Amino acid sequence: MSTIAVDAMGGDSAPEEVVKGAILAKQEGIDVILSGDKNLILSYLGDEKIPIVDYPQVISMDEDPAKAIRTHKNSSILGALTLLKEKKADAVFSAGSTGATLIGSISVLGKICLLYTSDAADELCS
């Protein structure tokens, strides 16, 4: 079974909606590790048991991605990417800053790692 490292703090409605998605994924049998502010994530998890790595800093959409990656060493996206580097996860998901994800992947993994897949890709991209 593959494990997905999820940037729980990335996205407009994070972490609440991201945690809800992680709970649904777990219920479908998908292994998830959440990266973000542990105390805040726990407040949305309820009784669900999903592993969390505590990376409390958030990179907002309006921040300069390169500067943010340099100054936010405990950011949730870097935490998720570190899980991938350490082979504790097989993939990373983030709904946060694409620029921070791109620069973070170069910083942590030494390569660009962005991928979009969807069964509906033809409809979405036509």
Residue ranges with predicted function:
Residues G104-S118:
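A glycine- and small-aliphatic-rich helix-loop capping segment at beta-alpha/alpha-beta transitions
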Residues Y116-S126:
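Single conserved hydrophobic/aromatic residue that forms the stacking wall/gate
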Residues M1-I106:
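Contiguous, glycine/small-aliphatic-enriched amphipathic segments in soluble metabolic enzymes
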